[in-house]
Structures are given as C-alpha cells and as structure tokens.
Amino acid sequence: MKRTYQPSKLVRKRRHGFRARMATVGGRKVIANRRSKGRKRLSA
C-alpha cells in the first residue's frame, strides 16, 4: 500500500493556495476567518 501523502508543490498551490481560496465564496470565508484569528500564514 502506498502512502497517502505524496508531496507536490504544484498540487499544493493549486488546491490550497491563496488564488484557489479567493476563487470561491467558501475559500474567501476561510481567508477571512484566518485573518480575524491572526494567522501568520493565510494559505499554503
């Protein structure tokens, strides 16, 4: 059985990056929540 986490910078950026978050309403909410909480990193 192969491991579930196969790191890829490209896939990481495309799925969880800032631009990907801003593309949807739900993603924008995620960014807003993380901003209000004061997270240092908003997205991947």
From Swiss-Prot:
<dbReference type="InterPro" id="IPR020939">
    <property type="entry name" value="Ribosomal_bL34_CS"/>
</dbReference>
<dbReference type="Pfam" id="PF00468">
    <property type="entry name" value="Ribosomal_L34"/>
</dbReference>
<keyword id="KW-0687">Ribonucleoprotein</keyword>
<keyword id="KW-0689">Ribosomal protein</keyword>
<dbReference type="GO" id="GO:0006412">
    <property type="term" value="P:translation"/>
</dbReference>
<protein>
    <recommendedName>
        <fullName>Large ribosomal subunit protein bL34</fullName>
    </recommendedName>
</protein>
<dbReference type="GO" id="GO:0005840">
    <property type="term" value="C:ribosome"/>
</dbReference>
<dbReference type="GO" id="GO:0003735">
    <property type="term" value="F:structural constituent of ribosome"/>
</dbReference>
<comment type="similarity">
    <text>Belongs to the bacterial ribosomal protein bL34 family.</text>
</comment>
<dbReference type="InterPro" id="IPR000271">
    <property type="entry name" value="Ribosomal_bL34"/>
</dbReference>
<dbReference type="GO" id="GO:1990904">
    <property type="term" value="C:ribonucleoprotein complex"/>
</dbReference>
